């Protein structure tokens, strides 16, 4: 529901000056969840049956430190690609440092003789990677597709359909199909998934559906709003089906005692892929659009009557209200149309890029093992404050 309410409440908050409540509402909800967990949640003991004091001693602290000092600068470097050129030290240095420490982390996990490694090798190699690695890759790619639509669709709304964002109420209305599509896909999985079964092929089919219609956003123009709305809805419906199924399949690729490990690793895959996708898509969209603006705007402005001697001055204020104020309405209209056409090129390249990632996701989904045998009503463990707690092996 947050993906439906969030865009609308966020924009409304900006317009009426109460945007902070979008964050306060989330903080209040999280605090209530914390209280519920604190007073009502009594989880079963760790499946390894290890006492807490022993667990604290045997945690892989070195691996944790290596991962943190590797992942943080790596993600910083990726995010910085949206701000600085790719050869800038702000980008290169964090990437090099991050890759170095993540390589050290991988070697530590592989070769150090640890009682409880954070990333046991057998989790990745089980069934030649079909149990966990393939589902985790599929999960990562599915999450990347959410970001492609979440970048492209608002860009279309703002640039093509709402006069640069001035008609914000209509923009809010156009943002709703994406959220409702995710709800539709997730609901359809819950209703029809257990009837269809064949979970591996459900995942493959939903990822293919998501990738197909998400990639078709490359057909975007200033004048095909209805078609693009349909493609966004269909793609995000596939996403809603695929994302929750991918989470479940990746969790089920390990033994019960390793659920915490699979959950943690698949979560890293998912959110790291999301950060990478957001940075890659934003960089491509920005750079491609700017390159085409430099190609299209001067000729469009000159054709609208702007003297060539003023082109340089115009290019400095493209995208601001100063265009109409300093160069007239006719030139401003020509520039706006040229910027929109440049944005079309940027959207197209991002959609093509997402297709490349999507193909990897489809292949990974097809390589997953079917988890039908685990999709049953058997309960492995019980909460310690329930009448069935005595059935737990560890307490």
Annotate each language-model stretch with its function.
Residues 317-395:
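Transmembrane-helix exit segments and adjacent C-terminal regions of multi-pass membrane proteins
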Residues 2, 180-185, 269, 273:
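MFS transmembrane alpha-helix packing/gate-lining sites
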Residues 38-68, 86, 112-127:
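Flexible interhelical linker loops that connect adjacent transmembrane helices
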Residues 5-14, 228-309, 349-353:
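Small-residue-rich alpha-helical segments with characteristic i,i+4
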Residues 21-25, 93-94, 170-171, 202, ...:
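Alpha-helical transmembrane segments of multi-pass secondary-active solute transporters
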Residues 1-62:
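Helix-loop-helix hairpins in multi-pass membrane proteins, especially solute transporters
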Residues 111-257:
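Transmembrane core module of solute transporters
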Residues 27-47, 68-80, 98-113, 362-369:
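C-terminal membrane-cytosol helix-exit motif in multi-pass small-molecule transporters
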């Amino acid at each position: 529901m947050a993906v439906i309410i969030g865009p609308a409440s966020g924009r409304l908050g900006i317009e009426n000056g109460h945007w902070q409540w979008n964050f306060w509402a989330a903080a209040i909800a999280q605090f209530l969840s914390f209280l519920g967990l604190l007073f009502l949640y009594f989880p079963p003991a760790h499946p390894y049956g290890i006492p807490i004091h022993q667990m604290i001693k045997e945690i892989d602290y070195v691996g944790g430190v290596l991962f943190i000092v590797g992942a943080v600068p790596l993600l910083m470097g990726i995010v910085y690609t949206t701000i600085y050129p790719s050869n800038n030290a702000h980008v290169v240095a964090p990437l090099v440092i991050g890759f170095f420490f993540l390589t050290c982390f991988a070697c530590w996990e592989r070769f150090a003789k640890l009682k409880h490694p954070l990333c046991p090798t057998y989790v990745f190699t089980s069934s030649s990677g079909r149990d966990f690695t393939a589902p985790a890759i599929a999960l990562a790619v599915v999450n990347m597709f959410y970001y492609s639509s979440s970048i492209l669709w608002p860009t279309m709304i703002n640039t093509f359909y709402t006069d640069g964002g001035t008609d914000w109420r209509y923009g809010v209305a156009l943002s709703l199909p994406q959220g409702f599509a995710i709800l539709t896909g997730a609901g359809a999985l819950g209703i029809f998934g257990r009837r269809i079964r064949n979970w591996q092929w459900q995942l493959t089919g939903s990822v293919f559906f998501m990738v197909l219609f998400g990639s078709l956003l490359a057909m975007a123009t200033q004048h095909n709003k209805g078609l693009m709305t349909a493609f966004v809805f269909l793609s995000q419906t596939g996403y809603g089906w695929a994302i929750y199924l991918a989470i479940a399949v990746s969790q089920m690729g390990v033994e019960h005692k390793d659920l915490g490990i699979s959950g943690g690793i698949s979560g890293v895959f998912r959110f790291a892929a999301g950060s990478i996708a957001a940075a890659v898509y934003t960089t491509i969209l920005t750079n491609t659009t700017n390159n085409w603006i430099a190609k299209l705007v001067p000729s469009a402005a000159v054709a609208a009557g702007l003297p060539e001697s003023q082109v340089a001055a115009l290019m400095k204020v493209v995208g601001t209200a100063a265009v109409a104020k300093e160069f007239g309405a006719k030139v401003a209209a020509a520039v706006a149309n040229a910027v929109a056409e440049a944005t079309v090129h940027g959207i197209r390249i991002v959609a093509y890029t997402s297709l490349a990632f999507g193909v990897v996701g489809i292949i990974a989904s097809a390589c997953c093992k079917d988890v039908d045998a685990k999709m049953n009503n058997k309960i492995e463990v019980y909460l310690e404050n329930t009448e069935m707690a005595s059935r737990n092996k560890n307490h």
